[in-house]
């Protein structure tokens, strides 16, 4: 039997996705190796994006959005099952000791998006009696909350079961069967299971199935209980201290956590781990030393190098990733479920997903070994090794492309030359000027029918627009044009706002204004900009799918004149950087890719060449060579010479 969707992993993330997909009418199967071992059972259930002082803007936004979903989401689950999730909007108190007063100040300065309040020593001790004597103040985060993580896991399982999700516990997935960029089945300890689409939500075990940089981070915890002799709950809000948190439950239990240990899958609690927790907790809230201990336990959180999750598309078109949530799996469950379901069912890719794509780790690689084994040589000749698997795709707004070269349709001497060049370039994205096609401008007659749009992704552009308002109108026309050509789900737009007729430099203010509106309307916006790092960051923050800084003025063929600024943009961007405009030769294309650009858009240099098709092929090869050189990592530049052969031990 072939299912619609198979979810690999039965923790909170996998189950949340399963419930959301089932509510949207799909047939869902969950494969779970060991439900009690899921990281959810080893968490504390804090919903604490403010107390955690998250500095990454995209992660902060993701966490805030997820926290805002919690009241309605848990209510829906409770209605489905009749069970209680233990959701409690109790707020979080973060006491500090002498010298820690600046802790939390970043949240306070956050433009009022999520409030935080400083409490002086007298106030905090009055607000929460029983704090340690050396607590000198603290921050109050009223919008943070908690949920009973173990109850939530049980409720999600019950909700999935009641909705008709096929739940399979005790199933070990041993491998993914892959053919031609697709997963065609999963090999399990009970046989092969097939589906149309697959979701990887295996948490700390993700690396067993794919070469993803997800590692286990062990966390030890314990639970104490408020004695019955204490008539009322002494704690009614979470205490968030330095490397310690204390989470009271309404059933009179109190969770104390958690260590963070990079020890692989080493099991069990340790005396050192428990001692560390008890010392930190008793210093923060001394009366805990008299409470009876109920239990100890441990679990494994899925950590990535940047401690951010991996969400969205993978190297296989029908495999979606949802892993690496580290400390925030419980918090991010509702937003992860919503975004993944939107992507799979509605083919909608939230711009925020691009920040958490797996390919970000390839950008960080400075070297990739090229020849590491004698198998790379045959009859004395070097064989070309394959490119790194995880670098095989360019991801824009959740859509995968193998080619990193985009081309255009303007300036060709004939439709035939344009068709030949598009094929020779190997490109998968072709940009089209909406206004010129609509008005059948010279050179654009019959353009819509000239290319095979079942193989090429159209990138409508707003060329010719001088104001933000004009660009927004043309973008809407472009979306409809793509639909007429069979690309119903195409929400891409190359945003150009260019009032300057001589140098054709984009208007930064108009571009930002148009981008903000188009993102709100659900467009994947690819803005053409001056090589301005500050503008690039602003456009990323408003949700653009890429930024497209110019190398030099459009059609000038001057090459890379903005290298320093493009490097800054690349170093700071968490969305793809596409160098656009001004590249005139393959050497310049290669240079741009060697800087670390994710892709190039080249039109004039191809269309105006004496042999456009040959130039298109040359640009394709240069793009690939530049990307490979970037991944390989160039040798360091030295002031003085360094001989390749030994300068000692010569024959005299």
From Swiss-Prot:
Its EC number is 1.4.3.19, 2.8.1.10. It is found in: Cytoplasm. Residues 1-366 are annotated as: ThiO. Keywords: Cytoplasm, FAD, Flavoprotein, Multifunctional enzyme, Oxidoreductase, Schiff base, Thiamine biosynthesis, Transferase. Pathway: Cofactor biosynthesis; thiamine diphosphate biosynthesis. The active site is at residue 494. GO terms for cellular component: cytoplasm. Its cofactor is FAD. GO terms for molecular function: flavin adenine dinucleotide binding; glycine oxidase activity; thiazole synthase activity. One of its GO terms (biological process) is thiamine diphosphate biosynthetic process. Residues 393-652 are annotated as: ThiG. InterPro entries: Aldolase_TIM (IPR013785), FAD-dep_OxRdtase (IPR006076), FAD/NAD-bd_sf (IPR036188), Gly_oxidase_ThiO (IPR012727), Thiazole_synthase_ThiG (IPR033983), ThiG (IPR008867). Signal peptide: none annotated. It catalyses: glycine + O2 + H2O = glyoxylate + H2O2 + NH4(+); [ThiS sulfur-carrier protein]-C-terminal-Gly-aminoethanethioate + 2-iminoacetate + 1-deoxy-D-xylulose 5-phosphate = [ThiS sulfur-carrier protein]-C-terminal Gly-Gly + 2-[(2R,5Z)-2-carboxy-4-methylthiazol-5(2H)-ylidene]ethyl phosphate + 2 H2O + H(+). 1-deoxy-D-xylulose 5-phosphate binds at residues 555, 581-582, 603-604. It holds the Pfam family DAO. FAD binds at residues 5-19, 44-46, 173, 325-331. Interacts with ThiH and ThiS. Catalyzes the FAD-dependent oxidative deamination of glycine. Is essential for thiamine biosynthesis since the oxidation of glycine catalyzed by ThiO generates the glycine imine intermediate (dehydroglycine) required for the biosynthesis of the thiazole ring of thiamine pyrophosphate. Catalyzes the rearrangement of 1-deoxy-D-xylulose 5-phosphate (DXP) to produce the thiazole phosphate moiety of thiamine. Sulfur is provided by the thiocarboxylate moiety of the carrier protein ThiS. In vitro, sulfur can be provided by H(2)S. In the N-terminal section; belongs to the DAO family. ThiO subfamily. This is Bifunctional protein ThiO/ThiG. The lineage of its organism: Bacteria, Bacillati, Cyanobacteriota, Cyanophyceae, Nostocales.
């Amino acid at each position: 039997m072939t299912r619609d969707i198979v979810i690999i992993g039965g923790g909170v993330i996998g189950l949340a996705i399963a419930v959301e997909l089932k509510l949207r009418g799909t047939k869902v199967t969950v494969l779970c190796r060991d439900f009690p071992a899921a990281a959810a059972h080893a968490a504390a259930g804090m919903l604490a994006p403010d107390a955690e002082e998250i500095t990454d803007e995209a992660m902060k936004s993701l966490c805030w959005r997820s926290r805002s979903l919690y009241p309605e989401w848990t209510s829906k689950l409770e209605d489905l099952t009749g069970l209680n999730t233990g959701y409690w909007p109790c707020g979080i108190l973060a006491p500090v000791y002498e010298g820690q007063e600046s802790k939390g100040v970043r949240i306070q300065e956050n433009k009022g998006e999520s409030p935080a309040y400083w409490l002086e020593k007298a106030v905090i001790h009055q607000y929460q009696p029983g704090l340690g004597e050396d607590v000198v103040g603290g921050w109050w985060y009223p919008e943070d909350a908690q949920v009973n993580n173990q109850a939530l896991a049980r409720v999600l399982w019950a909700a999935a079961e009641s909705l008709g999700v096929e739940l399979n516990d005790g199933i070990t997935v041993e491998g993914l069967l892959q053919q031609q960029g697709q997963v065609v089945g999963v090999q399990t300890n009970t046989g092969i299971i097939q589906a149309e689409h697959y979701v990887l939500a295996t948490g700390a075990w993700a690396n067993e199935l794919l070469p993803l940089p997800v590692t286990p981070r062990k966390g030890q915890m314990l639970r104490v209980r408020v004695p019955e002799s204490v008539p009322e709950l002494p704690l009614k809000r979470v205490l968030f201290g330095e490397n310690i948190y204390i989470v009271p439950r309404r059933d009179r239990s109190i969770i104390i956590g958690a260590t963070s240990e990079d020890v692989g899958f080493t099991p069990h609690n340790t005396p050192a781990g428990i001692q560390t927790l008890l010392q930190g907790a008793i210093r923060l809230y001394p009366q805990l030393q008299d409470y009876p201990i109920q239990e100890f336990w441990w679990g494994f959180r899925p950590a990535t190098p940047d401690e951010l999750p991996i969400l969205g598309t993978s190297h296989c078109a029908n495999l979606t990733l949802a892993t690496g949530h580290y400390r925030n799996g419980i918090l991010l469950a509702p937003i992860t479920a919503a975004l993944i379901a939107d992507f799979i069912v509605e083919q909608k890719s939230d711009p925020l997903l691009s920040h958490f794509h797996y390919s970000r780790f390839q950008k960080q690689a400075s070297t990739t070994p090229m020849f590491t084994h004698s198998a790379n040589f045959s009859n004395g000749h070097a064989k070309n090794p394959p490119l790194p698997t995880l670098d095989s795709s360019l991801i824009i707004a959740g859509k995968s492309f193998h080619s990193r070269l985009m081309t255009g349709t303007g300036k060709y001497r004939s439709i035939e030359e344009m068709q030949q060049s598009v094929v020779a370039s190997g490109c998968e994205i072709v940009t089209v000027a909406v206004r010129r096609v609509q008005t059948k401008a010279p050179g654009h007659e019959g353009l819509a029918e000239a290319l095979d749009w079942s193989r090429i992704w159209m990138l409508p552009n707003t060329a010719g627009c001088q104001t933000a308002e004009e660009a927004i109108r043309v973008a809407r026309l472009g979306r409809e044009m793509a639909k007429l050509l069979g690309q119903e789900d195409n929400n891409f737009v190359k945003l150009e706002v260019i009032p300057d007729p001589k140098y054709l430099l984009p208007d930064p203010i108009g571009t930002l204004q148009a981008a903000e509106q188009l993102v709100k309307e659900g467009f994947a916006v690819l803005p053409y900009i001056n090589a301005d790092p500050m503008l690039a960051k602003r456009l990323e923050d408003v949700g653009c799918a890429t930024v497209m800084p110019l190398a030099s003025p459009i059609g000038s063929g001057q090459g890379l004149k903005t290298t320093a600024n493009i490097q800054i943009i690349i170093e700071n961007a968490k969305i793809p950087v596409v160098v656009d405009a001004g590249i005139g030769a393959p050497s310049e294309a290669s240079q741009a890719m060697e800087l670390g650009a994710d892709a190039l858009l080249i039109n004039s240099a191809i269309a105006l060449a004496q042999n456009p098709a040959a130039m298109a092929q040359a640009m394709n090869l240069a793009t690939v060579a530049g990307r490979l050189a970037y991944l390989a990592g160039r040798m360091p530049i030295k002031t003085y010479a360094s001989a390749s052969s030994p300068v000692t031990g010569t024959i005299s």
